[in-house]
Amino acid sequence: MGPLSAPPCTQHITWKGLLLTASLLNFWNLPITAQVTIEALPPKVSEGKDVLLLVHNLPQNLAGYIWYKGQLMDLYHYITSYVVDGQINIYGPAYTGRETVYSNASLLIQNVTREDAGSYTLHIIKRGDRTRGVTGYFTFNLYLKLPKPYITINNSKPRENKDVLAFTCEPKSENYTYIWWLNGQSLPVSPRVKRPIENRILILPSVTRNETGPYECEIRDRDGGMRSDPVTLNVLYGPDLPSIYPSFTYYRSGENLYLSCFAESNPPAEYFWTINGKFQQSGQKLSIPQITTKHRGLYTCSVRNSATGKESSKSMTVEVSAPSGIGRLPLLNPI
């Protein structure tokens, strides 16, 4: 396509007075080899942007052309016209101040609004044919820019395998199809969903610590889609069965005993140590310097998660040998 011609500026005569998609227009009854066509540039333009109705294959020997809003060629729908002789622009009642017509018949609409959607009529008048002319129609199909969806959730801190979760994708519209994503993978639509809008609510009967997300929802219409910001769950779980380290259970008197306990838990669990059922101390680590035989017995690490209300424990038996020389039989002199 060639460059646009500059809009005429020698004389102006004024009477009293989203996203858009465009289809190509073929003019009717035009007795030339190359048909006049119109295309929108860009084919999709966001509300508030500019769109150019670019005319191709404009015939020679023209007297002028007129643009109308809609398919009725009357004064009320008259936007603007261009008279070749004198390079005159004439503006009608439908002119908003945002339209610019060029000498090649192309029409620029600036700061596009929803009201700009619909049909446009271009009437081309050839010299010697001022009354009949050639008329064609060009239609904008309104394409609204999708809003950015967002997720609401009934519980952002669910308990593992216990709480039912309900994700809702907003906003609600019968015109949207809703799609859910987990860790970048689309989730299958439940067979119970009969209408696309019903999929805007995602129900999870239970959730595990491996299903924290991120979760995203996407809304789609016939022209495109828009995805929400990711949402990550804080799944409460545990405590799992704890482990005690090191695992060996035999000590000599006078050695130092160091034990640590760990259990998977969110939030972190509280730790308690008991020896033979008697509370010893709290915390993950237990240390007893210079252990003696009185420290023999059953060592238990108990863990508790106040958020989940769960508890768990692990026990081990510790043996302590007597000091060297204690508890041994005296040596006998050989006969």
From Swiss-Prot:
Residues 147-234, 239-317 form the Ig-like C2-type domain. Residues 1-34 form the signal peptide. GO terms for cellular component: cell surface; extracellular region. Residues 35-144 form the Ig-like V-type domain. Keywords: Disulfide bond, Glycoprotein, Immunoglobulin domain, Repeat, Secreted, Signal. It is found in: Secreted. Disulfide bonds join C169-C217, C261-C301. SMART domains: IG, IGc2. GO terms for biological process: female pregnancy; heterophilic cell-cell adhesion via plasma membrane cell adhesion molecules. A motif (Cell attachment site) lies at residues 127-129. Synthesized by syncytiotrophoblast of the placenta. Glycans are attached at N104, N111, N175, N210. It comes from the Eukaryota. Belongs to the immunoglobulin superfamily. CEA family. This is Pregnancy-specific beta-1-glycoprotein 5. The gene is PSG5.
